[in-house]
Amino acid sequence: MDSPMKRLILLGLILINCSFVFADTLTLKSGHPDSYVVEKGDTLWDISAHFLKDPWRWPKLWGVNPQIANPHLIYPGDRLTLVFIDGEPRLVVKPHIRKSPEGRKMAKDGAIPAVNLALINSYLIQNRVVDRDWFDELPMVLGGESESKHHIVGDVIYIQAELTVGDKFGVYEKGREFVSYEEGEDLGVEAILTASGRVIESGSVSKVRLLSNYRETVAGTRVMPIEEDSLMPAYFMPRAANLETPARVLASEKELREMGKLDVAYIDKGSIDGVEAGHVFSIYRDGVDVVINGSGQPVLPNERSSYETVLSSVSSDNSIKMPDVYRGKLMVFKVFDKTSMGLIMINERPVRVEDKLLTPDALLVSE
């Protein structure tokens, strides 16, 4: 190999290495403060938004170890100061010590969470996506001691199964059935929690007393064990998702046509695809195909004639795909087998069903 070729290869390797370093470097927000005093109601994401262009990368700003369950706890009143360590921005904490008028140390308010758990607590407990056939085989509510069609807190309902006295169950109604965007694969059925109750009498038909209601409970709904504590993650460590194939927005939890910041969405990938709680995706709208008509002019999809639509589908020579359009960021907070639920943390444009979910640009390479 001649010397110029060697130099060219070496230059290419240097450029690749530099691009890795660039992608891994935190970008500070223009006009960021040098320090910040934590306030009650803040989240780690909110605080990082004062300093970072990509606030979801707050673990790197704190220099946390992702293997530690609670790598960093900060509290209202703590002062955060921006410093640079080996050229990288970091936040260091000066703890605030609360004292009583007598000078005694007082207990701190609760630690600041990664995201506002109040936004997702109900979804963590109430929503599941399960196998359709499995759901249909669950024990069924037959009715109740009262002759009412609807049952509320304090009522006793009858379950078509022998259950263990003292066990706690959730009552679920069947919601939407989900299929994948491209293959039409069955992804499961939405199970919506209507009530919770405890078994008070066992038999071929068991009795359950309702302890809480989210919706009115009716005959035909299904019951399954509810384990509220196991469904509540103590900590979300945001990190880049990196799947083999793009995910898609499957549905809006509230069945909205368009979603914005802090709305909850279902996506069409789950644990079997490698999705985990804390995974962050960039959201994109597919770029449209522009057709070049007989006059050599570009025609958008909503302006095409029937002929131009057919032409675009049979000949790529007359169709040009526009770039995908960035919509925002989504963080997964609950994972099922084939689907997951995520919170839209950033949105620059409205998010819709079928929007594409990709690895965030800032972390296309491993840290």
Task: Say what each PLM segment does.
Residues 10-14:
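Hydrophobic helical h-region of N-terminal Sec-dependent signal peptides
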Residues 1-8:
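Positively charged n-region of N-terminal signal peptides that target proteins for export
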Residues 8-9, 22-367:
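Surface-exposed, polar/charged interaction patches used for macromolecular assembly or partner binding
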